[in-house]
Amino acid sequence: MNELALFAGAGGGLLATQMLGFRTVCAVELDWYCRCVLTQRQNDGCFRTPFPIWDDIRTFDGRPWRGIVDVVTGGFPCQAYSSAAAGKNTADDLWPEMRRVVADVAPRCVFAENVSRVAIDQAADDLEQMGYKTKAILLSAADLGADHIRERYWLLAYPDNESKLLRQFHAKVGFLQGLETSVWSSDPRDSRISDGMAYRVERYKAIGNGQVPAVAATAFALLVARGDI
């Protein structure tokens, strides 16, 4: 499946979708440091094929990708749904931009992530109005045996006629069973990004904001494995 990765960060979510067999064909990421990491990872051969990286989702046109992209993924920012924002939309609310891209691309499925239940509920409501069925799950890194929490809500959306496609995924994700026993062999707090740049603050910010690949892949697998899909 061809993936359009929104809010791609430094590539944690993209590594998860690589585990699931996706092929990233385009990414969107505003942070310059994360874009540098994504470019370096492509040069390192971490991804199946090279892909373009757009900077600002607010200027990204998804229409040329209709018919090419099968799945849109993204951990959209949660600032607009924080307690400080009192759940009100602000200039930081970028879910409407992700929703716009989904409408333009019309993907076969959508996989989204957020730390806020309110944000995920809003996304689910909007996607259901667009004709998708949705499933959500709460899963943290600690649930897979890590010594840090990183609690996240994960949302999978798909049209009724794609149920067969998702069942096929179920047969491909058995390798994720037992992943928690092997993925935490090193302390994530000591992670290093070997990209030749010494931007420690930016590196830690990217790690802190990013998705844990094993958690993202497992969340997708669990959502697909639900009996009513």
Protein language model regions, located:
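Conserved active-site and SAM-binding loop architecture
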Residues: 1-229
